């Protein structure tokens, strides 16, 4: 279900704004997207895992809030991010 630390580090390196960046909206959204995708795969095989489904919904909501924030703050960075992540919005 959870993504490995190595995969998380790869995502951070790919989406960071500067060398020590771990908390920018782009990084947070990219990590959440990877976790959401992993949890979706888990829920495809374990359809009755309602506890994980609730966690998935919370992650989707958190990602939505971060995307809204980024869209208000910098529309160009927002568009580049959703294009690179393949998020339908």
From Swiss-Prot:
Keyword Ribosomal protein set for record: yes
UniProt GO cellular component terms: cytosolic small ribosomal subunit
The keyword Phosphoprotein is annotated on this UniProt entry: no
SMART domains hit by this protein: Ribosomal_S15
Entry keywords, A to Z: Ribonucleoprotein, Ribosomal protein, RNA-binding, rRNA-binding
Protein task: One of the primary rRNA binding proteins, it binds directly to 16S rRNA where it helps nucleate assembly of the platform of the 30S subunit by binding and bridging several RNA helices of the 16S rRNA.
Family of this protein: Belongs to the universal ribosomal protein uS15 family.
HAMAP family to which the protein is assigned, alphabetical: Ribosomal_uS15_B (MF_01343_B)
Name of the protein described by the UniProt record: Small ribosomal subunit protein uS15
Species this chain originates from: Staphylococcus carnosus (strain TM300)
Organism ancestry: Bacteria, Bacillati, Bacillota, Bacilli, Bacillales
Gene that encodes it: rpsO
